[in-house]
Amino acid sequence: MLHTLCTDGKCPSKADGWGRGTATFRILGDICTRSCKFCATKSGRPLPPDPNEPAEVAESIRLMGLKYAVITSVDRDDLPDGGAAHWAATVRAIKEVNPDTIVEVLIPDFDGRTDLLDVVITSRPDVIGHNIETVERITPLVRSRAQYRRSLEVLRYIASQGAVAKSGLMLGLG
């Protein structure tokens, strides 16, 4: 089953986004291994990754005629590679089926492991995002396993590899 944040997140701008040729897909299931205070995603023990998901996401993007696709995921701390290989397979599948679609990935921190970041980077997404979410002072209160400085290092590493790095903050959390 494919998941989009447009639908699962009840996005009020879904029609506008889809009309402009953009959508956000969530891969690796709908159950997160973390339980961040700001997020409404279910947490617990997720199912194994669906090996058909990369091809299904790529085909959905083709059928929707998307010009810009954003891929995000739940955190998968239960997997030895945090889902990095699945991320890379998804990017490669999208690029193969939709060579003109811009692919932005919004990745977890992979516990700061550069070997896992490299797996995603070498799949060649157009933009690699990792959200810091909030200021350093309240990070421990709202992000269950994340570390502010580790997130900065993740972004620094992505940029040092020549990739376009992007981040986001939520307003109103301190």
Residue ranges and their predicted role:
Residues R20-V127, T134-I138, Y148-S160, S167:
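Conserved Radical SAM active-site core
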